[in-house]
Amino acid sequence: MALHRHPFVHGAASWDGEQPSPVQLPHISACPFTSSGRKEDPFYFTLDPTGQARQPLDISAFSRIMTDMGSLNSADDHRPETSFYSGHKLLSLNTDTDPESPSLSSHSDSQHLHSLSLSAPCSETDNKHDMQYLAMESTKYPSQWSESRTNRSIITTLSISQRSKDDIEPNNLQTDFTRGDKTPREKTQDVTLENAANGWLSAKAGRKKRCPYSKHQILELEKEFLFNMYLTRERRLEISRSINLTDRQVKIWFQNRRMKLKKMTREHRTRDPGTSFTV
């Protein structure tokens, strides 16, 4: 069987003729390697331009990837994220076996998240695979997931507090604006209404201050009351001038004194009904 010559490009191989579909590719068997690292079979060739020996590849995994890509090309709706996800699963499995490469795993995680954000809506099976991958990553790096959750909670609380502050500030501005628009007359009316409310709550709101009489004034008034319970205007003026009081004060004092005397006689009659007390 004669082999056809094909143009060779570093890192890739192409054919001049019609390219076959990936579905029609047969499963590739393992490549035989010698102790020096070079291949003995002439049907295999290396893609390394330096000629150095390469590590043996996982051919079964490669064939499975190619089969998946062929099935996707034959379908109507092509989603590249599925093939990338399968390759990413292999990469994550390789990084799990090699714990000394955290940078490679973090880079692959970021690429996977970026491809998921830019890809079209996936089916339910793809969503299940993504959820399983996120659960595996959360169990693998719990500290990073906890930090991201705390950062998201802090951002939400800050946004809520900013919204509440923005809602409160217009209300404060409106109240200040209404207070500044009041005229002096309205301000005085508000002050009088507040004073009236406070005075209504107090016990002695509308009463004048009580003016206590001195002992000399009370003695002179009591003497005059013993002789005359009802005074004439001239006598009332004389008494007011003598004890340094006004005519109205003397008149009110005599009225109160007469009411007190009636009250005393009424109580005395109820206490001793047999006795009579003349006024």
Swiss-Prot record:
It is found in: Nucleus. GO terms for cellular component: nucleus. Residues 101-112 have a biased composition (Low complexity). One of its GO terms (biological process) is regulation of transcription by RNA polymerase II. One of its GO terms (molecular function) is DNA-binding transcription factor activity, RNA polymerase II-specific. Keywords: Developmental protein, DNA-binding, Homeobox, Nucleus, Transcription, Transcription regulation. Belongs to the Abd-B homeobox family. This is Homeobox protein Hox-B10a. It comes from Danio rerio (Zebrafish). The lineage of its organism: Eukaryota, Metazoa, Chordata, Craniata, Vertebrata. The gene is hoxb10a.
